[in-house]
Amino acid sequence: MLFDKVKAFVVEIDGARTGTEPVFHGGQAVAGRVLLELAGAARVGALRLRARGRARAHWTESRSAGSSTAYTQSYSERVEVVNHRATLLAPDSGDIATLPAGRHEFPFSFQLPISLVTSFEGKHGSVRYSIKATLHRPWVPARCARKVFTVIEPVDINTPALLEPQAGAREKVARSWYCTRGLVSLSAKIDRKGYTPGEVIPIFAEIDNGSTRAVQPRAALVQTQTFMARGARKQKRAVVASVDGEPVGPNRRALWPGRALRIPPVGPSILQCRVLSVDYSLKVFVDIPGSSKLLLELPLVIGTVPLHPLGSRSASVGSRASFLQDWGLCTMMDRPEAPPEYSEVVRESQLVCASPGPSSLLHDLGVTTEGPYFACLQEFRYCPPPLYSEEDPNPPSEAVRPRCMTC
């Protein structure tokens, strides 16, 4: 406006770096200030602040009501997870206060709820957090300033359920033009259910090809976004990482002694939201010429708190060693790497969409290719875990020492 005396009106949050969104988790205190700079004395009615966090899902579907009639069905659902209001400036007497020219600061602080939902952006839904300041003045439209912040809820993979090995087995009779070509079987296992971005998933698999044609084993990390509204569901799947094995010839058997699949910088699993969820799974499958693929799916949870360096990690390595012993692969086991911190993997420079994976792999898994492959989140500044060490300060006695921990 030509005679507007407001030179600057912004919301600042403590701890935020220039050009980045501040990051919090449930239970933390959010503090900052509203900055108001006036070119001259101005009359102000009130300055109000509102912090909001919303999870929403929305999509439309085309429906047919006959041969010549069509309509669009809309589905929407919204959940408010944060709603904080505060008045930062209210005149003591009367309805109007006069502020002199210059810079004015109005501090604020509030506590986030203990349990929140991780920030998320998807095609059919989102989880967003923001702080909005509104300046009310007489005879002038209200002026607003907004600041967005990110929430990442801790997902600790050091729980017994997420440290359990995941395994499965499937078999299929290969057929072509009503002719039986033999039995193809697949068994696979990973040493635990929970991982963090940047870690490598060692895939142990056995492919037994009893058919008369060569088959192609593959594995893929798949993200599934599920949106829920008015009793309906909408899903979006994307391949975020994949690895191919060597073809297995007719009547041959092949082993994967820990085929490595590295997890890219993806957002963590979202499991406790009423309107949307983000799940991950490892799909190990075999392409059989002339027949449908043989598919085995193992559930995964992508967390933010990495594996502890000693206790739970020893259990994970032990389960992996036990699996290798069962398959006679103990000599092939590599020394495990220390898991990276979440903030080392998911950084600002990686806030771009991943490049599309192989189109044939997407088609095989029934995954659509439109839209971003995954939503990366900004750097999450947890306190760093203890330094990683391969040596246990309290080693077990020789009588109970595992036979194959670091073969």
Swiss-Prot record:
GO-annotated cellular components: cytoplasmic vesicle; plasma membrane
InterPro entries: Arrestin-like_C, Arrestin-like_N, Arrestin_C-like, Arrestin_domain-protein, Ig_E-set
Coiled-coil blocks: none
Highest taxon, organism lineage: Eukaryota
Pfam families cross-referenced by the UniProt entry: Arrestin_C, Arrestin_N
Assigned protein family: Belongs to the arrestin family.
PANTHER family reported for this sequence: ARRESTIN DOMAIN CONTAINING PROTEIN (PTHR11188), ARRESTIN DOMAIN-CONTAINING PROTEIN 2 (PTHR11188:SF48)
Subunit structure, interactors included: Interacts with WWP1 (via WW domains).
Protein name (Swiss-Prot/TrEMBL): Arrestin domain-containing protein 2
Taxonomic lineage: Eukaryota, Metazoa, Chordata, Craniata, Vertebrata
Annotated gene: Arrdc2
